[in-house]
Amino acid sequence: MRKLVLLRHGQSEWNKENRFTGWTDVDLSVDGVSEAAQAGRILKKNNYTFDAAYTSVLKRAIRTLQIVLYEMDLLWIPVYKSWKLNERHYGALQGLNKDETRDKYGEDQVHLWRRSVEVRPPALEKSDKRYPGNEKKYASLKEEELPVTENLEDTEKRVLQDWRELIAPNIKGGKNIIISAHGNTLRALVKYLDNIPSDGIANLNIPTGTPLVYELDENLEPITRYYLGMDGKIEDDKFPKKV
């Protein structure tokens, strides 16, 4: 049996302000720092250790991972950063308040933009200062790799490239792995691991700063999965069922 730990970053400043974040590189809030430290203490208390870690190139996920590894005395392990583990790109919605956006466009439309597997939010113009091509961290990417908007399917496609090429081979090789990433990045991976249909993933919410543990067989098929608290497993009966 192999264990994989998925961790959504601690609360960010824009989580706190209820704004669409996407690829905007905002930092953790004070509460988010505390959540990350608590996650590290939980993992240490439950005797977890890691051989390598994966994260995005966004500071809220990177900093969460650094805090967790500090709490576990594991700052020395290799950390791999990849833009393919970035949050889903929310296009022109990035920076907007979610409640104000609902008031303007309606609850149903915003729910589709947020939760639909196929529907993309309105796209950014490449002249927009929020376009990722303006950031040095993406200078090595081809123009066609830089999103102006994404749906969950787009996000899943890039996440699974890293999963198949980098992460899964390490797990099969016996490595203990933690992935510190984002709500939609992890929803996309959960959808794949648990073979959840598109209409079953819409209402899945992965909480910030709470370790999600997958126990996998030798073929990386899930045996079980659960959230982890100070006292051990936290079962979640609201988790979508695999088909």
Swiss-Prot record:
Look up the signal peptide feature and give its range.
Answer: none
Q: What is its EC number?
A: 5.4.2.11
Q: What pathway does this protein act in? A: Carbohydrate degradation; glycolysis; pyruvate from D-glyceraldehyde 3-phosphate: step 3/5
Q: Does the keyword Isomerase apply?
A: yes
Q: Does the keyword Repeat apply?
A: no
Which enzyme class, named as a word? isomerase
Q: Which amino acids does the record list as binding substrate?
A: 8-15, 21-22, 60, 87-90, 98, 114-115, 183-184
Any idea which UniProt keywords this protein has?
Gluconeogenesis, Glycolysis, Isomerase
What is a GO molecular function of this protein? phosphoglycerate mutase activity
> Which residues does the annotation list for site: Transition state stabilizer?
182
**BP GO annotations:** gluconeogenesis; glycolytic process
Give the reactions, separated by semicolons, that this protein catalyses.
(2R)-2-phosphoglycerate = (2R)-3-phosphoglycerate
Q: Which domain of life is it from?
A: Bacteria
Q: Which SMART domains match?
A: PGAM
Q: Which residues form the active site?
A: 9, 87
Function summary: Catalyzes the interconversion of 2-phosphoglycerate and 3-phosphoglycerate.
Its family remark reads: Belongs to the phosphoglycerate mutase family. BPG-dependent PGAM subfamily.
Q: What is this protein called?
A: 2,3-bisphosphoglycerate-dependent phosphoglycerate mutase
Q: Which organism is it from?
A: Clostridium acetobutylicum (strain ATCC 824 / DSM 792 / JCM 1419 / IAM 19013 / LMG 5710 / NBRC 13948 / NRRL B-527 / VKM B-1787 / 2291 / W)
